[in-house]
């Protein structure tokens, strides 16, 4: 009987010590970086992205098929074109801390999962997306990688808006000359 009592007491002690482990220490820049990510998305939704959120050596990582990386100027131009021809709204967004892939420690980077509702003319498409941003010591966004089928979604919106597609094609042809 004493053996059983001792075993129960030992088990209870183990459970208490396991439950008493301290909270996971958050990277002190994480909350500031989440605010920067949200500000970038707010700017996209309001059609006015603040370039000061981004480092001068910013890279928008090309994650699509044969998509090249874009620097800050090219990314700002791309986003300006997109916000000119469509409205976007991020819903059901979840923000999570990222980790250093070598040390597996929290590094201040931010991941997000969400659904983008994109509207062009009368057409609307919804798109599930995942993305990750890394930041420099000044708190500026250093890189942004996002994963979703943006090309198919944009193509579906253009298919329902042939007049916008024609204008974009004319602009592309003028730029190529």
Regions found by a protein language model. Give the residues of each.
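Short, surface-exposed coil-to-beta transition loops
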Residues: 111-113, 124-131
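Bacterial N-terminal signal peptides that target proteins for export
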Residues: 1-8
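A short, surface-exposed beta-strand/turn
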Residues: 127-142
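C-terminal motif of bacterial Sec signal peptides marking the signal peptidase cleavage site
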Residues: 14-18
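Short, cysteine-centered beta-strand-loop-beta hairpins and adjacent loop/turn segments enriched
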Residues: 67, 117-126
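Low-complexity, intrinsically disordered terminal/linker segments enriched in charged
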Residues: 144-177
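Short, low-complexity N-terminal intrinsically disordered segments enriched in polar/charged residues
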Residues: 19-43, 168-177
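A solvent-exposed, acidic/Ser-Thr-rich amphipathic alpha-helical stretch
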Residues: 48-108
């Amino acid at each position: 009987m004493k053996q059983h009592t001792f075993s129960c007491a030992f088990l209870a002690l183990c459970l208490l010590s396991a439950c008493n482990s301290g909270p996971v220490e958050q990277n002190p820049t994480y909350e500031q970086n989440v605010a920067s990510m949200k500000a970038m998305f707010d700017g996209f939704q309001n059609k006015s992205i603040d370039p000061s959120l981004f480092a001068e050596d910013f890279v928008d990582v090309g994650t699509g098929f044969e998509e090249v990386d874009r620097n800050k100027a090219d990314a700002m131009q791309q986003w300006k074109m997109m916000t000119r021809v469509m409205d976007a709204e991020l819903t059901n967004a979840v923000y999570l801390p990222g980790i250093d892939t070598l040390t597996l420690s929290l590094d201040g980077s931010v991941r997000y999962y969400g659904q983008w509702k994109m509207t062009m003319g009368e057409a609307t498409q919804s798109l599930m997306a995942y993305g990750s941003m890394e930041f420099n010591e000044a708190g500026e966004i250093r890189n942004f990688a996002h994963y979703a089928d943006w090309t198919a979604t944009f193509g579906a919106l253009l298919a329902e808006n042939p007049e916008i597609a024609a204008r974009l094609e004319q602009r592309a042809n003028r730029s190529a000359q």
